[in-house]
UniProtKB/Swiss-Prot annotation:
<protein>
    <recommendedName>
        <fullName>Inorganic pyrophosphatase</fullName>
        <ecNumber>3.6.1.1</ecNumber>
    </recommendedName>
</protein>
<feature type="binding site">
    <location>
        <position position="65"/>
    </location>
    <ligand>
        <name>Mg(2+) 1</name>
    </ligand>
</feature>
<feature type="binding site">
    <location>
        <position position="141"/>
    </location>
    <ligand>
        <name>substrate</name>
    </ligand>
</feature>
<dbReference type="GO" id="GO:0005737">
    <property type="term" value="C:cytoplasm"/>
</dbReference>
<keyword id="KW-0378">Hydrolase</keyword>
<comment type="similarity">
    <text>Belongs to the PPase family.</text>
</comment>
<dbReference type="GO" id="GO:0000287">
    <property type="term" value="F:magnesium ion binding"/>
</dbReference>
<comment type="subunit">
    <text>Homohexamer.</text>
</comment>
<feature type="binding site">
    <location>
        <position position="55"/>
    </location>
    <ligand>
        <name>substrate</name>
    </ligand>
</feature>
<dbReference type="Pfam" id="PF00719">
    <property type="entry name" value="Pyrophosphatase"/>
</dbReference>
<feature type="binding site">
    <location>
        <position position="70"/>
    </location>
    <ligand>
        <name>Mg(2+) 1</name>
    </ligand>
</feature>
<dbReference type="GO" id="GO:0004427">
    <property type="term" value="F:inorganic diphosphate phosphatase activity"/>
</dbReference>
<dbReference type="InterPro" id="IPR008162">
    <property type="entry name" value="Pyrophosphatase"/>
</dbReference>
<keyword id="KW-0963">Cytoplasm</keyword>
<feature type="binding site">
    <location>
        <position position="29"/>
    </location>
    <ligand>
        <name>substrate</name>
    </ligand>
</feature>
<keyword id="KW-0460">Magnesium</keyword>
<feature type="binding site">
    <location>
        <position position="102"/>
    </location>
    <ligand>
        <name>Mg(2+) 1</name>
    </ligand>
</feature>
Amino acid sequence: MFIKKIKAKANNNEINVIIEIPMNSGPIKYEFDKESGALFVDRFMQTTMSYPCNYGFIPDTLSNDGDPVDVLVVAHHPVVPGSVIKCRAIGVLMMEDESGLDEKIIAVPTSKLDITFDHIKELDDLCEMLKKRIVHFFEHYKDLEKGKWVKVTGWGDKVKAETLIKEGIDRN
């Protein structure tokens, strides 16, 4: 995959997200090598937890941690790693870990991909239990890894998410 050829924005209101980890998959952390385009096993997670949403990144961006901007894509189905999915940002999970700030954009598929998310415009439109699962996952998925930790500091709205995306595009 030629990751560098994929733009961050599909259009003004849509972002491209490259999926690295499907929702509900085994406790394996995958990461794309941005130079080669190969999908590597980053590590086997020591907790027996699975990602509550599809997890990936926005290409052609750079976040404060030196990696592309991270995204959780809320969907009804797992998405195959390497797939590019057009999404709308609806908010952001604010968190930090042993390496510093590590925000996660929360997004939903565009109307063309799945009309069942058309009513989701912001975080408050998501099921409260899903938000609790997301927080629980990130608060605990590194619990058994020595020297690693996560602190969830709250949620940011759609405007905050769009600001982080724009900063990520500008930084790259």
